[in-house]
Amino acid sequence: MELRARGWWLLCAAAALVACARGDPASKSRSCGEVRQIYGAKGFSLSDVPQAEISGEHLRICPQGYTCCTSEMEENLANRSHAELETALRDSSRVLQAMLATQLRSFDDHFQHLLNDSERTLQATFPGAFGELYTQNARAFRDLYSELRLYYRGANLHLEETLAEFWARLLERLFKQLHPQLLLPDDYLDCLGKQAEALRPFGEAPRELRLRATRAFVAARSFVQGLGVASDVVRKVAQVPLGPECSRAVMKLVYCAHCLGVPGARPCPDYCRNVLKGCLANQADLDAEWRNLLDSMVLITDKFWGTSGVESVIGSVHTWLAEAINALQDNRDTLTAKVIQGCGNPKVNPQGPGPEEKRRRGKLAPRERPPSGTLEKLVSEAKAQLRDVQDFWISLPGTLCSEKMALSTASDDRCWNGMARGRYLPEVMGDGLANQINNPEVEVDITKPDMTIRQQIMQLKIMTNRLRSAYNGNDVDFQDASDDGSGSGSGDGCLDDLCSRKVSRKSSSSRTPLTHALPGLSEQEGQKTSAASCPQPPTFLLPLLLFLALTVARPRWR
C-alpha cells in the first residue's frame, strides 16, 4: 500500500512538472501578431517571429515562460536596447556639451573683444598722441598684446614676467629716443635697467597694470578654461561603454515584456531607476567634484567686477600704457639726472640730431566699459545654467527613465517589474558605485571602478584647485587640463575604501521571487503569466521521474 501511494505521488509530481513545463494548451496557441508588428517596426525580419507562442527554454535573459521570442530575436532586441540606451546617454551629454560650448564661446568672444578693442584704440590714438615714441616702437606694443592673448588662451606664460620684460625693453628704446644726442651702449642700458625698479621711470602705471591685469586675466582665462574642461569631461564620460551586466538588465527592462506576451506593460518607475543606477554607478561618482567645479566657476565671476575686474582691466590696457609714456616724459629731466648719477656720464653722439623735438603728451581716453549690461547678462545666464546642471550625474538615471523609457503611469500593480505585470517591491538604490552593492537588477563589482571616469574626476579636482587659486589672484601654471592622465589611482583600479571590502554577490538568476510580487490577475491575464510564474525543470528530469514512479509502483501492478 505504501509503495502504491508513493508511486501515485511521484506520478502526480511528474504530471505537474510536465504541465508546468509545457503550459496550458490554450496559451500555447496564442498569437504573436502584436509582437510581430513591434519587431518589424524596428527593422528586423519578420521571418524570425513565430506565428504563435513557443516554449521559452532557449531564452537567456528573459524569464523562460511561453514566449514570442526566438533566441535570435532575444539577441537582436538585447543589442537594440543596448544601442538605444547608449544613444540616449549621448543625446543627454550632447545637450550639456552644447550648453557649455555656447557659454564658452560667448565669454571667450566677449573677453577677446575687450582686448581687441583696447589694441585698436591704441593703434588709432597713439600715433597722433606720441608720434615717433609710438611709431618706432609699434612692434613692441603689438607683441605685448599678442602675449596677453596667448596668456589668456592658456599658454604657459608668467604674466608678471611678461609685463616686466615689456617695460624693460620699452624703457631702453624710449630712453634712447628721448636722448638722441647721447651715445648709449649696451652696458649703459644694462645699468639703466638695473636701476629701473628704484627709479620708477613710468610712474605707478606698471605696478597698477601688473596687479590688476594679473587678477583680471587669471579670472577670465580660468573661467573659460573651466567651461572647456567641464565640456571635455562630459564628452569623455559619454564614450564609456556599458558593461554586459548592464546590457542584460536593460534588455530585461525594455523588451522582455514583449517576449512574454505583454508588450503593453511599461516598466515600473522604481524598477527602471534601479537598472539605470546600476548601469550608471560610476558616472554618479562624478557628482561631488562636478559640483565643486561649478561652484568655483560661479564664485570666480565675482572677480569680473570692480576696478580690478575683467571688464575694467582687459578693455583698458592702452590707458595704462599711455599713462606710462606720459610719466616718462614728465619725469625725463629728473630721471636723466639720476641715471647719470648711478651709471656715469654717457658720451655725446657727434652725429646726433639738432635741437630737441617738442614733447608730445598723449591725452588719456576715459576707461570706457563695453555696452552696459553685456557681461552682466552673460554672467546671469551662466550662473542659472550652471546651477541647473549641478545634479546632472546623479539625476541622469531618473531623467533617462522619465524621458526615454516610457515608464508606466498605471497603478503599481499593473507595470512591468522584470518578471511579469505586478508591483515592484525592492527599494531604490542610492547614488554612486558603493551604493550598488545590493542592487537587485544589475550585478555591479564595486571594487572595480571605471578608470576613465576616475581620470575625469581627477581632472575636475585639478581645475577646481586652479579656479580657487585664481579667485585669490594667484597666477597658476595652466597646463592642458583635458589631457588624459594615468598617474591617479592605484594600478588595480581600486579605491582604498572599496578594495578592502570583499563582496559575495548572488547572480540575477538566484534572486528570490518575493522581490517581484504578483497581484491578483484576471483570468485572461493569469493565462498569459502562468507560464512565466512557473519554474522550469530541466527537461531530462521528466522521464527520470516517470521511470522512478513506474519502478516504485511495479510490485503492486504485478
Curated annotation (Swiss-Prot):
One GO process term, biological-process aspect: heparan sulfate proteoglycan catabolic process
Lipidation (GPI-anchor amidated serine): 530
Name under which the protein is recorded: Glypican-1
Disease note: Associates (via the heparan sulfate side chains) with fibrillar APP amyloid-beta peptides in primitive and classic amyloid plaques and may be involved in the deposition of these senile plaques in the Alzheimer disease (AD) brain. Misprocessing of GPC1 is found in fibroblasts of patients with Niemann-Pick Type C1 disease. This is due to the defective deaminative degradation of heparan sulfate chains.
Effect of residue 79 to Q: Protein yield reduced by half. Protein yield reduced by 90%, abolishes N-glycosylation but no effect on secondary structure
Propeptide position ranges: 531-558
Spans annotated as Disordered: 341-374, 505-534
Modifications after synthesis and translation: S-nitrosylated in a Cu(2+)-dependent manner. Nitric acid (NO) is released from the nitrosylated cysteines by ascorbate or by some other reducing agent, in a Cu(2+) or Zn(2+) dependent manner. This free nitric oxide is then capable of cleaving the heparan sulfate side chains. N- and O-glycosylated. N-glycosylation is mainly of the complex type containing sialic acid. O-glycosylated with heparan sulfate. The heparan sulfate chains can be cleaved either by the action of heparanase or, degraded by a deaminative process that uses nitric oxide (NO) released from the S-nitrosylated cysteines. This process is triggered by ascorbate, or by some other reducing agent, in a Cu(2+)- or Zn(2+) dependent manner. Cu(2+) ions are provided by ceruloproteins such as APP, PRNP or CP which associate with GCP1 in intracellular compartments or lipid rafts.
Result for mutant: residue 337 to D: In a breast cancer sample; somatic mutation
Organism per entry: Homo sapiens
Region forming the signal peptide: 1-23
Chief location bin: membrane
PROSITE patterns referenced in this protein's UniProt entry, alphabetically: GLYPICAN (PS01207)
Annotated phenotype, changing residue 116 to Q: No effect on protein yield. Protein yield reduced by 90%, abolishes N-glycosylation but no effect on secondary structure
UniProtKB keywords: Cell membrane, Copper, Disulfide bond, Endosome, Glycoprotein, GPI-anchor, Heparan sulfate, Lipoprotein, Membrane, Proteoglycan, S-nitrosylation, Secreted, Signal, Zinc
Known glycosylation sites: 79, 116, 486, 488, 490
Encoding gene (name): GPC1
Superkingdom: Eukaryota
SS bonds (residue pairs): 32-68, 62-256, 69-259, 191-343, 246-279, 268-415, 272-401
InterPro entries xrefs: Glypican, Glypican_CS
Topology versus the membrane: Lipid-anchor; GPI-anchor
Localization: Cell membrane; Endosome
